[in-house]
């Protein structure tokens, strides 16, 4: 970037927008960041899994207002193996139980042979997890699935 303007690059690996892609990225993320810092990114094989990935955020109600915190989260150990759960708003309580600490708490992600398949697998991960004030959207991926179906 050759300019007198200052640009802020704000990128967080824990943002829900990045988590489905984190499943697809096969290269070591530390190596990628180090290479980017050193200006040698072209030397890294940033292999991507070509399959689609879908991520469903699980939040604490009444997100985005002040969410309820402290609910014990159940079912993390029963999530299907083909789904991955990213933690964002969790902690361990005094008894070692995973609790919701507010806002966007978890993101259940999955890869699939199609967007519809990835969506089904991600929602299977969501279905395994529960806590008292949990909520999630049930329409994640619908636009991409409609495009996929229209394409044949």
Task: Annotate each PLM feature.
Residues 57-59, 88, 111:
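Generic beta-strand/beta-sheet core signal
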Residues 1-6:
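Short, small-residue-biased leader/transition segments that mark boundaries at the very start
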Residues 12-82, 93:
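Active-site "cap" helix and flanking loop/linker of ATP-utilizing ligase/carboxylase catalytic domains
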Residues 7, 18-20, 52-54, 83, ...:
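Structural beta-strand/beta-sheet cores of well-ordered domains, especially the beta-sheet scaffolds
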Residues 37-39, 85-91, 116, 138-141:
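Short C-terminal domain-edge/linker segments immediately following a structured domain
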Residues 71-89, 108, 116, 122:
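RNase H-like, Mg2+-dependent phosphodiesterase core
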Residues 94, 100-152:
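Generic C-terminus detector
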């Amino acid at each position: 970037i050759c300019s007198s303007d200052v640009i802020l690059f704000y990128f967080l690996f824990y943002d829900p927008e990045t988590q489905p892609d984190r499943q697809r990225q096969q290269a070591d993320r530390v190596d990628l960041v180090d290479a980017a810092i050193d200006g040698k990114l072209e030397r890294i094989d940033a292999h991507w899994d070509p399959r689609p990935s879908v991520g469903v955020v699980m939040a604490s109600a009444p997100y985005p207002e002040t969410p309820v915190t402290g609910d014990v989260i159940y079912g993390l150990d029963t999530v299907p193996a083909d789904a991955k759960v990213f933690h964002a708003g969790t902690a361990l309580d005094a008894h070692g139980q995973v609790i919701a600490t507010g806002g966007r708490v978890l993101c259940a992600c999955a890869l699939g042979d199609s967007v519809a398949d990835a969506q089904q697998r991600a929602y299977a991960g969501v279905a395994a997890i529960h806590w008292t004030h949990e909520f999630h959207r049930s329409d994640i991926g619908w636009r991409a699935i409609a495009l996929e179906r229209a394409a044949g």
